[in-house]
Amino acid sequence: MDSTLRRTWAEIDMDALAHNYETLRKRIGENVKFLGVVKADAYGHGSVQVSRLLQESGADYLAVSSIDEAVELRHNGITMPVLILGHTPKEEVSELIKNNITQAVTCRAKALEYSEEAVKCGGTLKIHIKVDTGMSRLGYLCDGDYFESGVEGICEGCTLP
């Protein structure tokens, strides 16, 4: 295939994005938190640009895939809470703490590992506990036979140093 025929791109209308955010905000109400997912460079639309707009518009949180994406936002003036949905190596816990980034945790072992590293750093790591709601992908299992152990794991994760 001739590469000159493949000139595809996406143009983002920031006014339309702001309008869409406002429409969603009105629909969900002020008492519901809004998390904008900007992983993978906001799906190719420019994570810093989209994050700035969401921050200025009053969104509550941002979510990214990796620590690199989160730190890039911090280095570009994004101060709102950022959640990493993917895995972060324990060696990066000090960077998470330094940049005030929240890490998703999917199991007890990972929560304990992160807690141990945070204690070594002398800091506190913010975590978000993922709960598997039925897709059987990631998170604490809290249904059927796993309900009791899942709830216990979540409670334990909430009290780690």
Indicate residue ranges for each PLM-predicted region:
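Positively charged, low-complexity intrinsically disordered leader regions
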Residues: 5-29
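Active-site-proximal beta-alpha core segment in soluble small-molecule metabolic enzymes
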Residues: 2-11, 32-161
